[in-house]
Amino acid sequence: MCGIVGYIGPKQAAPLILEALKKLEYRGYDSSGIAIADGTKLGVVKAKGRLSVLEEMTDGGRSLPGCLGIGHTRWATHGEPNDVNAHPHLSQHGDVALVHNGIVENYIELRDFLTEQGYSFMSETDTEIAANLVEHLYRSNREDGPEAAIREALSLISGAFALGIIFADHPDTLYAVRKDSPLIVGVGKGENFIASDVPAILKHTRQVIRLDEYDMAVLTAGSVKIYNRYGEELHKNIEHIQWDADAAEKGGYPHFMLKEIMEQPDVIRNTVRPRIKEGAIDLGLYHISAEDIRACDRIFIVACGSASYVGQVAKHYIERYTRIPVTVELASEFRYSNPIVTDRTIAIVISQSGETIDTLFALREAKKRGAHVLSIVNVVGSTIANESEDVIYTWAGPEIAVATTKAYSAQLSVCYLLALYMGHCRHMVSDGELKSCLNAIEELPGLMRGLLEKSDYIKYLASLHFSCRNIYFIGRNIDHALALEGSLKLKEISYIFSEAYPAGELKHGTISLIEPGSLVVALCTYSPLTEKMISNMREVKARGAVVLALATEGTPGVEETADQVMWIPKTDPFVLPSLAILPLQLFAYYVALLKGCDIDKPRNLAKSVTVE
């Protein structure tokens, strides 16, 4: 969601913060702002729209002198996107400037309290309330200092938050706190930083401290101190970031999304190769034992968005190889559904960022009810990873485009390994079958690379269909799970209305939407159901639809039935989903490109969803 950056050091803060905020644009935003302490007062500039507007207003930051500052990119949750609602928020008397990622759930109660204290409010946001609350508490007991005021404010605020705070009369100190929303500290040489994510500060330091729940960071140019909610100083580990800034750049591609699509063969290799050792799978599980897997009688897969569609594919594999019933639940629904969970339940939670708030809260609900919790996460040291019993990292590297591609594929490859591993633990996957499937996984990157080299044909197909108003995706079994992801990719970045349906359900109502010229993308990679899919294609063609099929090379009847076909190589069916998703990603990309859409930062979307 929102992006936070803060700096304290010898350099001019504003230009540095503006540059760092650009590295967080992938999180999604509708406005931005910056606050600088110049030694006498706090200067704040905010603007609706792109960061370029803020840069122009501040002459690239040069009109805001000072070596302490905070910056913010906002994705609206309280109040419409405009200059007034943008962050940072300056308190009524100008003592405090504050940036915030999250939601203050009890903002009405706090607003009423502050109104009684003589405060009025300029914006519609919950963040302005937080800024004024900190100021009120600071002014009420100034001799105890900013830390005491912040700590007391945290005890009064309900909700999820990451806060960056500066005080007019402390122009040498930057404060940061977090609860349920990610925030890191960058440790430099004679300078220090805060940020929502590593790419923002990677140009300046590779030394990072990840704040935990209720941690407060107090930063000067030469020191970093971390305290818990009780004011006790903590000694935190400093993490050295291995990947470099170039990994977060486009590398010659016009968009991050295309770069990340093309990186997928290497990503899959990086994800699976270290986990296949001498014909066996080593997932590095230290707490969930083979005995726990054998005793398991139910599995929940809990995720949001594309990760939930990975879960839909994983369900087929895990049930096939373990015969354990699997339920895929949207994280936003799971925690409110009174799920039937016991100590024999395994909850698999999937999140690229490891900070998705709905998934985090669902994880906590599963733990509270006694489930074993295993997470599949990309970001090392993230909250979901830290709170899970075991974690499998996807090692996909930074994913900048809002629409996920390589993280999806990495999650999928982990799920292949997990299904086989669990099946082997339960003595339902033989050594021979395991070897065959692992061989297929190891051959997958080469097949993916060959398929991606044929992207020009997908671009041609996109040129035929980019003006469609509605596009429907259909499939059966695993193909339906892939259709869901293909449809989501298309509507995320092209803004074309699209839905995915189980092909067998067409006749139960959906077929009434089909009219002459409708485009139906029909997935036909699951060979046991080929004949039924061809019948479904004929059904929609009879109503005037244009059929674009996605099929495995050599599948009989497809070429004769469909208007166009996206072919994928014939290989072991075990890994077909990883191949089938590539043309769907490319099709969505090229349709959006031809429509002139903002591919990497589609409207109204955020990369890391850290509010409910």
Spans of features found by a protein language model:
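Active-site phosphate/pyrophosphate-binding segments
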Residues: 264-268, 272-300, 390-519, 592-612
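Conserved short alpha-helical segments that host acidic/polar catalytic motifs at enzyme active sites
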Residues: 1-250, 254, 266-297, 336, ...
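Glycine-rich phosphate-binding loops that contact phosphosugars or nucleotide phosphates
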Residues: 291-443, 523-566, 587
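Glycine-rich, anion-gripping cofactor-binding loops and their flanking helix/strand elements
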Residues: 184-210, 332-366, 505-541, 571-585, ...
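Glycine-rich oxoanion-binding loops at beta->alpha junctions
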Residues: 67, 71-84, 277-291, 315-350, ...
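Generic C-terminus detector
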Residues: 231, 546, 559-561, 571-612
